[in-house]
């Protein structure tokens, strides 16, 4: 019986709408070249602000797991 083998890649994504949108955008982009995505782990979240303190961009770094072979 063959065991499933996974691979993990790390990606970064950003959005002007929020963290959830940044996650969705990152997964959508990576799914164009990677098949069999099984999950993602968000390991860092940050924001960019304007001079007056308003959030202008939400950023995430995530590890995406997918099956190979």
Regions found by a protein language model. Give the residues of each.
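A cross-kingdom feature marking charged/low-complexity
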Residues: 41, 46-69
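Short, well-ordered alpha-helical segments
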Residues: 4-38
């Amino acid at each position: 019986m063959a065991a499933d083998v996974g691979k993990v890649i790390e990606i970064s994504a950003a959005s002007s709408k929020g963290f959830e949108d940044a996650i969705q955008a990152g997964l959508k982009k990576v799914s164009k070249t990677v098949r069999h995505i099984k999950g993602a782990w968000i390991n860092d979240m940050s924001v960019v602000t304007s001079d007056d303190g308003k959030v202008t961009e939400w950023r995430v770094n995530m590890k995406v797991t997918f099956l190979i072979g």
